[in-house]
Amino acid sequence: MLFKARTMTSILVGALLLSTAVPAAQAGEITSGLQIEAGQTFELGGGQEGGFTVTGKNNGPVAVVVLGQAEGKAAVERGTVAPGGTVDATFGPGEMALLRNTSRQKTARLKLKITGDTSSLGMTYSGNP
């Protein structure tokens, strides 16, 4: 009977560890030396299950506008990151982060860290409106 009790305890502990590991697998960290060409917007996320946070520094020569866009909604400006300035913006589940280069001539450069639900973040570029 002692063997069965230990086996059952091992199974329960294993199941508990597995159930706590699944949410942890969704959390992650991405570091990026991001470049955004003149007249372009970097689009991050949209449709993901959890939220994420973007932190970092604008180490380029031009300002970058940070916006958030919930699914089916208009983009909402969160602020502008001047050259040498920092960004710390949190985006909710399903929300997209938009980082817009304000220049039509120069490339924007940022050093970013993205934390939170990074497992399914899409990344693409689009032309500025």
Regions found by a protein language model. Give the residues of each.
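Short, surface-exposed beta-strand/strand-loop-strand elements in extracellular ectodomains
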Residues: P61-R78
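Tight coil/turn sites that cap or link beta-strands
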Residues: G33-T41, G45-G47, P83-G84, G94
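Sec/Tat signal peptide C-region and signal peptidase I cleavage site
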Residues: V22-A27
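Bacterial N-terminal signal peptides that target proteins for export
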Residues: M1-L12
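Short strand-edge motifs at loop-to-beta-strand transitions and within beta-strands
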Residues: G85-A89
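C-terminal partner/receptor-binding element of secreted or periplasmic proteins
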Residues: G28, S103-P129
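Asparagine-centered strand-capping/turn motif at beta-strand->loop junctions
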Residues: V54-V62, L99-S103, I114
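Bacterial N-terminal signal peptides
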Residues: S10-T20
